Amino acid sequence: MTDDATTTQVGIQSLLDIMRQLRDPDSGCPWDLKQNFHTIVPYTIEETYELADAIAAEDFSQIRDELGDVLFQVVFYAQIASEEGLFTFEDIVDGIAEKLRRRHPHVFAATDGQSVSAGEVKDRWEQIKG
């Protein structure tokens, strides 16, 4: 494993641990403990709009910060789901990795060496998604 991969894993684990602490029934944050899937939706939407605004402004420092806020929302949903026995953060990561491999056979499946245009990729994506 590379140093970058290790650093990333440690960072993600730290974020997951922080979320678990925030939601700890005995010592967590009262506000975070009251939240559920429905109550955090407005915050998810707000953070997504803030990210879009930062992108429109090409403010890369702000983009980085807003991406962190969006990632935190994902971690928040995952923690709630884990507490309810529905799914985990790891399930989310595994699911999106599998989906991306499935939707990009031109990259991840054996190919005959033919190049694929962006338009063909989009058409295949819609076929596979459908």
PLM region spans:
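Flexible "arm" and connector segments at domain edges
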Residues: 1-66, 72-130
